[in-house]
Amino acid sequence: MAQTLSKISNKENASVGLWPKRFKPHQPTPTWMVRCGPLDHDSRHGRDPVRASPQAKRVRTPNPYPRHLKPAASAVVRSGTNPSHLKPTSTDVVRSGPETPCCEAKDGGVVRSCKTCNLKPAHDSKAVSFFPAQTDGLTGDEPEFIAEACPSCVLYDTCPNCTSRAINDDGSTDGTIPSWDQIETTPAFLSLLSNTDEEMSADELTNLAAHLRKAFETGSHPPNVDYSKDQLQGLLEMAEAALPPARRQTLPFYQQRLEARRTWREKIFNLPLDELSKILTTSKDRFQRCAAWKVVLEKAVLAKEYGEEAYAYAQEALKNINSFDVNLVLKMAAGTFIGHLRMMTVDNPDMVSYLPKLIVKLKPLTLKMIIDNHENTKEGWLVTLTSLAELYGMVEVAIDFVPTVIGNLFDLLMKTTSKVYSMFKSVILATFTSESLDFTNPFWYAIAAILCFLITGAIPHNGKMKIIKNILSNATGIVAGVKAIQTLGAMFSTWSNERLVNDLSSRTIAITELNNPTITADIDAVINLQRLAETLREEVKSHTLNPLMQPYTPILRNLMSALDNVISCCTRRKAIATKRTAPVAVILTGPPGCGKTTAAFALAKRLSQQKPSIISLDVDHHDTYTGNEVCIIDEFDSSDKVDYANFVVNMVNTNPMVLNCDLVENKGKTFRSKYVIMKSNSETPVKPTSRRAGAFYRRVMIVDVKNTAVENWKRENPGKPVPKWCFNKDFSHLHLSMRGTEAYWREYVLDPTGRNHQSQKAPPDQHVTLEQLDQKMVVQHTTNTSEFVTQAGEVPVFGFVCQNNEIDTVYNLLAAVKARYGANFNLYKGMTRTAHENSGCGAHVHVISREDNFRGKAFTVNRSRLESVPHLEGDSFRRSLGVVMSDKDVTTMFYYIKGKVINDQVNLTELPANQHVVTVHTVYDMAWALRRHLKWTGQWQLIKAAYEIMCYPDTAACALRNWMDSTDFSEEHVVTQFIAPGGTIILESCYGARMWATGQRLIRAGGLTEAGGPQGGVRFAGLGARNVPWSEILREFMTLISHIWSQIKGATVVLTALTFYLKRFRPRVEAKGKNKNKGPRKNTGVALTDDEYDEWRQYKAEKKLDLTVEDFLQLRHRAAMGADDTDAVKFRCWYSERQRNYHDLEDVTIIGRGGVKRELIRKGPLRPRGNDFYDEPDDWYSEGVIDGVTHKNAIVSVDDVDGMHKGYALHIGHGVYMSLKHVVSGNAKILSEEPKNLTFNGELATFRLNTTLPTAAPVGTSKPIKDPWGNPVSTDWQFKNYNTTSGNIYGACGSSCSLTRQGDCGLPYVDDHGVVVGLHAGSGGDKCPSRKLIVPYVKVDMRIRDTCTKEYYKDNVPMISYKGLLVKETGEPRTIMKGTRLHVSPAHTDDYEECTHQPASLGAGDPRCPMSLTGIMVNNLQPYTEAPRTDTATLNRVTKMLISHMEGYVPKIHKTEEDMISAFYMLNHDTSCGPYIGGRKKDHVKDGVLDKNLLDLLSSKWNRAKCGLALPHEYALGLKDELRPKDKVAVGKRRLIWGCDVGVSTVCRAAFKRVSESIMANHALGFIQVGINMDGPAVEDPFKRLERPKHDRYCVDYSKWDSTQPPKVTSQSIDILRHFTDKSPIVDSACATLKSNPIGIFNGVAFKVAGGLPSGMPLTSIINSLNHCLMVGSAVVKALEDSGVQVTWNIFDSMDLFTYGDDGVYIVPPLISSVMPKVFSNLRQFGLKPTRTDKTDAEITPIPADEPVEFLKRTIVRTENGVRALLDKSSIIRQFYYIKAENTENWTVPPKKIDTSSRGQQLYNAGLYASQHGEEFYTNKIIPLVQRAIEFEGLHIEVPEFHQAVQAYNGYFNGTEDQPSQIALASGGTGFGGEVFEN
């Protein structure tokens, strides 16, 4: 669809007189290009013109312009460039273009008739369009003009309004234009709604529009069946929203569409918001909806004129897509609940009398008896209902009413059920026939239509219904039915998404059209517009993350780009209009050569870490200004042509200074440096007689710079250069003297009167150093930044909106309330405000009508009732007005105080009522009382005031004055009277404060404490709750609950205590007969949960006890609280055993003679009970199980061979466990395994298991603080041998209150940090239960000893130097393979020198480069000896940004491959096995079975990896056999081969295979292009992303990429991959391995890499690409922040990248493009070497828009066959020169044997690639090479012609034919196949 937008855009517009590409001036003008009127097709074909019908509707033109855009006079404005709101002042008809008006305007500017244009009256229409006479040679009368009732008809009809008359209802024509059948078969029409590049011609567009016009009028026309009239307009609307306003003229019908929206705007501008909301949600006319959006947003932007309601509505509407306002419903529900609760509790005037009456009415005792005797039977319900009716006196009513209602309902239910059943049965039987399905019943069509309406929000039209019918009618079987349902679901989803995109496009158009200075004239409008654009952008962005919206992602991105332009434009306009802090300017004056420039730069470095910006006043534009904190202006007064005085005055100012810039992107740039350093050789830059002298010298500090050594040298040595010793690094050679303020010379300052400039002597100069000058400038800037801001801020304004006849009533009511509560607000009638906002004033309250344009908090008066003053208590004023106000708003309105006021004169009538009276005896009394008035942030001012009063008690009033100037007061209204020895102080605070202080004793009694204030709670009336925030609703609910509790808390406590008291002494019911001595089973008042009930029954059954429920619960409670009585101890033991054996029981259902019952059956054998006591007091014994121990997730049970629990073991990490010797002795089983590698250290036992728990406990050697159950333990931590029942145990004795039992041995003791320091080994038994025996932890080396794994780089081998490298000897020589498999072709033995590439250097015997292979290897390894550095903080931030970006398209968790063999078969078996096993992987696999050597190696690596441990990271090094440029061959440059160990590759593939596949599968959405097929349709995705408007494109390559990779960046990339895995031990092992330093093995030595990334590392392409993204992102963030732009957003949301290893394409916006030189500089600081793709040393610059982009050695261009990635010609040509065959050292000799089959296929494919470069290259260059190869190499292939080659490649490209293996390999890399053809 996105391509179709450009397809129908002809780049010319009829309104400006431009012709489309396919039309010439001599051709007839097409109908859609006529400016003023349609072609007269009736006259052309010999028919009389048809007059308009009398039923033509009339149109009224309202005047809905806002008051800021009202025209001076009315006029009819037609198509032109003037906006709709700029009306001309004349009464003439205004046309576009320079034509002279030809019509007579009568009746107020309305066109009645025109002889020149042949216009006739159109039924007295108020506003008409007109068409001038035809100028294309046509003759005859013109058709009468008809005023349309709907402005959109101009769009839907357009010029085909006349041509549609030549079309019949069935789609046939009279031959003048094509019929509908012919239209449908045109290629352009068939591609209209498809993703093709064919452009629709103007004739076809005109004919199609004519048929559409006919289809709009006639329902039987064929397009109504197949297509929707909204499809074409929807495409145009999306195109208009995506294009910038300047380019929208290129769209067809743009002026007509614009005129339609303008006309709609005029019609609906004055409608209220609710009517506009209906249009937005229900209108099917897209032009009407778009105009409605523009009206809503325009009123929101101009909130000053139309009120905050419009802005709030627009903000909410932009976020919602026709959604139900659930928030309002919830608010209304909450408000209703609170209101009813208040009515029943607080508002009830007499709770005491109301409750008894309610109880008597309810008759609870009788009601309880009826309920208790109810039975769930028919007779029971009849008796119960009759009893209830008799109880409440409704017997007769029930007898008459209930049977009638029940009977009627039953009859209605039976009839409805019968009819529904019959209909449903008939439909089902008709659908599911015996042979097939039949969905042709209208019932199914209706169901599908309803579903379509529910999903898409619109009823399907005829075309859609036809599609639905076709789908349902074709569903004749089960499979077809399922497919039909899937098809309908997908189709409904597509329609819904299209409607959504159209809606977003309408909003975007409205936003962009409002970005006009004529509309958004003030800063408030600009701010509102930016907020609305940001809101809409977030909405659009949220839809881009929806997977169902992926087909529309390009359109949504274009919408976001358009909104970004609006936001950036608003930002610039705000910056221009925003007040700034005046910079600090200093002028360094002195003679030339004294060192001013060096001092200026040194001062700039002290002031800021950024490099200073440089401005030169000799040029008239300042595009190079960077906006850094410090700005240096050299010789600012050197040119007399520059008005530098005014420049400095404007620069050092609080008003924004807009710089003069030439570049468009820099328009609006402002000066924003903090410090300005200017230099001058003149002591008086501005003459004192100048008119700007005062303003100039007031803004600058002048420092005279003097260098005595330089002056003496010049005086004593004239003509000689100044030596360096005259200058010192510490600037001690300079003498800096700062002048006084306004000193234009050292001796004089400016005269204030301006009469005598030498009348005022200047103060002495102040000697300063650079450091002092730096401090002064910083202090001065801090002073400039600080400005006085009133604490209270803007005075709040409230408005009560009512009818005109209610204004006096509401005003009098508010005046009475103000007098009653002593309120501080100012009351007005209407909008006029008479009170001044002085300190101490209150809020402004206006009583206004609905017509007033009020700005502020408005509350609608639902009713007005003037109460008497005694009735205005509590919240009656809100009830009387029917307004919904929160308590916070009421407090603010009544008692808001602006600023702080201190009154020395006390007037009793002005004093507020006291809330608190405090007698001040000490300073603490006052401090404690003052806390009520302060915020939390103002407590420290309170401490300061208290200290002053304590030191000087007689000056309390003065101390309070000083304290009020600096403190922050609370938003609550508080009044406190302080009675001090020196007088009385009354303090009132609410936002601000008022204080009255007098030396007399004044007692102001009474107040609001008892009567209460006006804050009586929120009253929710109707929909008024929508204006109350949720915080106020919650606050009101909590206040109401506290109020209710304050009324009932006393009675509640008393009744609760009474209930407990009566329950305690309740007599028990004794049973008789058989149940004697048994507790009662019924009506005991005890409720048990299911688990408690099961415990009670099981405990009674096992212990053979007759235990009541109450006794059981008491026993259970005592045991849980740790009681030590016998019953409690036994219950704890039983409960622990039950918990441990929970899984040994099975709940089964038994069916037998006794019926069906459920029982718990034990699955394991019954264990014998152990002994409870030992005779000897010092015996230690093993203990039982108790839940809730520390580190319980790391603890496992140790069982005997028969399943008997023995103790515990603790997991300490990587499969290592520790326990005790007497626990694991014998045949112990842990997790059904026997311990391995069992090691004893005294009593402590350490061992391994194959099972690794996910949780491990930390271990240490400190002193224990807590026992296993978290209780404190006391111990001296002295170790000795103790005699136990298990022998002597070496440990320490401790004391704890925890009770232990058998089986607790092995539980951990921890220190204060939770680290395990010992294990529990026993206790003192029942005679001394608090004594515990603790075995300390001792570190044991449990590292795995490799038995099968070889490792060359060993720690115990000394380091040696080998040819300049630090290496270790391996003891096994490994030589570098010599020779090459590349031979010169027999066809080119004489001219192979013409080829640009040759086989790489072969070593010392090679005449091209005699360097040995070892020397080449060592030279290649030298860069790996150093580790590049990066900015760690920035790198960590960018890593989080990249993860957040990738989470949008990469699934979160990928499962690890757990099978070793499966992981091995995921590898490429044609690659090396690494340093430990020779050959390739496939050499060790026979018939799918691995040989012993490979299997042993993989098993050892896999077992180690399952423990999460790192593997040896070693590689076998070699040199790559490939073709290299001849210049690189001459210097011996040859690339390394890193052969990775097959075990490491298998582990890494198991860990990250699925993650890498997800990243590769989503290359179209992300930055990483690994997996892209460059020879398929996938190449179109990057091509589209490259066409991003207003973005710069950079193509970058890197030299020596592998050796320059920082290890920190590689580690972060590996962590990113781990983030998307399940983090299993295999993943941990892979991460630890890849993060370790690689080891290279060659020539019998092992070399450890310090930095860089081996090219043979697993996942090298993915990791390299992630490294690429991270380093580019870090460089961009650092460059922006160094330029003063703080990056607080995700940088990857602002740019687009293509990365594949070291190849990169960066698509950046202007902001980032402006700092790209710094970005490349930062990349070089990271150690990288960025270059151009052509490998030249020129600067990296953006790729122009008209030049193709090169990526992966491919040039991405659009050819006549589509988008193609062209392989460079040199890569294709050199394939004919060389052949890969047997190994040789004489590569200039052709091979002895040539594989003609593969060689022929190779050259055939080369021809296919060459065909994409054009016929000339293919015919003149490639065909001769192919023919020569056939002749000399003996090949048997046919040379395809050019068009055959193009057709074959297109077949491979589009997937219609399978790609040959070489093309498949080449599409993901740089060559055809193998390393022969790599660059």
Curated annotation (Swiss-Prot):
Residues 1591-1716 form the RdRp catalytic domain. The active site is at H1222, E1243, C1305. It comes from the Viruses. Residues 37-98 are annotated as: Disordered. The keyword Membrane applies. One of its GO terms (biological process) is viral RNA genome replication. One of its GO terms (molecular function) is RNA-directed RNA polymerase activity. Residues 564-720 form the SF3 helicase domain. Residues 79-93 have a biased composition (Polar residues). InterPro entries: ARM-type_fold (IPR016024), DNA/RNA_pol_sf (IPR043502), Helic/Pol/Pept_Calicivir-typ (IPR004004), Helicase_SF3_ssDNA/RNA_vir (IPR000605), Helicase_SF3_ssRNA_vir (IPR014759), P-loop_NTPase (IPR027417), Peptidase_C24 (IPR000317), Peptidase_S1_PA (IPR009003). Its EC number is 3.6.1.15, 2.7.7.48, 3.4.22.66. Residues 1188-1341 form the Peptidase C24 domain. ATP binds at G590, P591, P592, G593, C594, G595, K596, T597. One of its GO terms (cellular component) is membrane. The modification O-(5'-phospho-RNA)-tyrosine is found at Y1093. The record marks E148, A149, E435, S436, Q791, A792, E1070, A1071, E1183, G1184 as: Cleavage. Keywords: ATP-binding, Covalent protein-RNA linkage, Host endoplasmic reticulum, Host membrane, Hydrolase, Membrane, Nucleotide-binding, Nucleotidyltransferase, Phosphoprotein, Protease, RNA-directed RNA polymerase, Thiol protease, Transferase, Viral RNA replication. This is Genome polyprotein. It comes from San Miguel sea lion virus serotype 1 (SMSV-1).
